[in-house]
Amino acid sequence: MCGIVSYTGHSQAAPILLDGLSKLEYRGYDSAGLAVRNGENKTRIVKAKGRLKALAEKTDNGHALAGTCGIGHTRWATHGEPSETNAHPHTSDNGNVVGVHNGIIENYQELKNKLLRKGYEFYSSTDTEVAVKLIDYYYKKYEHTPVDAINHAMVRIRGSYALAIMFQDYPGEIYVARKDSPMIIGVENGDCYVASDVPAILKYTRNVYYIGNLEMVRLANGTVTFYNLDGDEIEKKPTQIKWDAEAAEKAGYEHFMLKEIHEQPKAVQDTLNSVLKDGAIDLSSVGLTEEELQSFSQVYIVACGSAYHVGVACQYVLEDLAQLPVRVDLASEFRYRNMPLDPNGLVIVISQSGETADSLAALRLAKKKGLKTLGIVNVVGSSIAREADNVFYTLAGPEIAVATTKAYSTQLIAGYCLAVQFALVRGCISKGRYQDLISQLQCLPEQIQKILDDKERIQWFAAKQANARDVFFIGRGLDYAISLEGSLKMKEISYIHSEAYAAGELKHGTISLIEDGTLVIGVLTQSELYEKTISNMVECKSRGAYLMGLTTYGNYNIEDTASFTVYVPKTEECFATSLAVIPLQLMGYYVSVAKGLDVDKPRNLAKSVTVE
């Protein structure tokens, strides 16, 4: 949520800042601003409410702002309404300190009251202005030493934050600090870059540094210096980003989401290949040994949003194949419950960005209680990747659309591979069955491509449903997990009210919501539950529902019940989520397109939720 881009070097800063901010639009925002300084001159600040193009128009695409040092920001309102006044950057009373901030300062009112007593005045409703003026207060108190000033402010701020600060007394320099909010540093040919995420600076450099929690950075004269909370210098090594800038472009597709849907065969294949060696699953890169796999008596899966839906699907697969008890929790609930945890348990935390605030907090809680932790993440060097005991990296590449598709699919693959290996090591499946499962996994990319090649039928049907008022997804067992993700895709990008229900629960209240014309989508990939779900669909139809069925090739008798049916290739039933979710992603996408909505940046949503 929110985005920060900063630059100091030899080129004009403002166009670079605007370009970087455009690569962070997927994070969600309601206003934007720039602060640029030209040598010894005072910093110029320009802000605009609304989309980034308004800021670009105000600054002639950045060319109207002279200067080679600057900070930029896209704001997601938390404290104070969306407005130019509340937009970042913010400044101290005398303009000596200028800064931007991501995150939430929990004790901002307490700090604000302190500063009011010290004679400070406030022009905005934001917690960011409080942080900037707190730094200014300590800067004056500790005799013009930026590192000490920021250090003292960090000690007193409670909450999560990433800060980029410029000081009038230090032209050409930028100071950065973070706690529980992501920030990266890039260096190339004497130029220094700061960003909330890699795509913002990938056009300029692939050499990045990840700032640790409660660390600070000084960028000056083409070099970066890292400090700990005590103000002592620390050494860091850069990380080389493997993917290129083109991977974060639309490549001819109308939307990033459609591009990323079509990238799923490759993303799934790449993630599989990362752990498949000589026809077997090799988890050495993950760091889990066979002895450890045998020792776990319980698995906890913790995640948010679509990653939580991955967890629900993987629960079924792990329990079925490995006969291992699995508990799935929303990270925002897990972290606040005082529940007993099995000391021999494994806590799996799933997060595309590796920075999801609640998931990161849940990981830290699990580690504090002494449990082994495993992160399934897509971003190398992210907070969860650094702090988890073990990491399974998905190879989805950059995912720009807010609604996840390929990251979700690669997370499923990670879960499948863990489940299959657990099952073999624990003696729950034979070697022959193990090889069969791996063969089925290797078929998934081609099967996903087959579904994508036949997407026109889904596009046609979706256009007819653009005016739907309610959509209900129903399924049993693993099909319920699929329904959860299908429903989320529908509601988050088409703004149609949608819910997913375990089909067996319909009679316990939900069926009262069914009326003439209500679209009900039944998911039926599990053969043992097929007839029961058909019966539930018939119950809905008798109350006026319009039925769509989603099942595997061969189940053609569903056409006696459903008015429209989508078929997916047959696979091992425990892997069916990977195929059945594709038509539901396309359904949500095409409904949104038919309604003329902003598919990649739906209202009120952010790609990476880095605040609680």
Question: Where do the PLM segments sit?
Answer:
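Structural beta-sheet core signal
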Residues: I4, G99, I165, V176, ...
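Generic C-terminus detector
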Residues: Y546, T561, T571-E612
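Catalytic-loop motifs flanking and including active-site residues across diverse enzymes
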Residues: D127-V130, V310, C314, T410-G415, ...
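Glycine-rich phosphate-binding loops that contact phosphosugars or nucleotide phosphates
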Residues: Q294-C443, V523-P569, M587, K595
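Conserved short alpha-helical segments that host acidic/polar catalytic motifs at enzyme active sites
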Residues: M1-E254, E263-S295, Y336, K431, ...
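Active-site phosphate/pyrophosphate-binding segments
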Residues: Q264-V268, L272-Y300, N390-L519, S592-E612
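Glycine-rich oxoanion-binding loops at beta->alpha junctions
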Residues: T68, G72-T85, V275-E291, C314-I350, ...
